[in-house]
Amino acid sequence: MKSLDKKDEGKKGEDGEAGNANTGFFTPNNKIDFSNVKIEPLFEETVDFETFSKSDFRAVKVKDCVPVPKSKKLLQFTLDDGSGSDRTILSGIHAYYEPEELIGKTLIAITNLPPRAMMGVESCGMLLSAINQKKDSDEEELHLLMVDNHIPAGAKLY
């Protein structure tokens, strides 16, 4: 997985153009090739607005991220959700990210899900990510939803 550090800004990417290489954010200089991406079909079942609006989507800042002992998949996130108390969320994304590359990032979480114990640790929410499969391959890609670091911890998404 490529680093998302600020130090990569201004470097020339594989296409030879300067831009915010490896930041995960679109800039006019970034050329993205989606020709080898297979997207799952949209759900046909609809969710009424009242049900959807019960989900509390918040910007969260990654204070710490470590692998969960005895798990190959889980990462344990310590997050600032703007409440003044740390929030712990576990996510099965270790195959796609190394913990240290996520510290300091701003992510999106659903914060009002009931707590769930995994590997002896209580997870209090869910981090949002996008997942797709490469065309003509069984290889799956996962991209954690990262947003602008100027968004404060606890900001509500509408």
Protein language model features and the residues they cover:
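Phosphate-backbone binding interfaces of nucleic-acid-interacting proteins
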Residues: M1-Y158
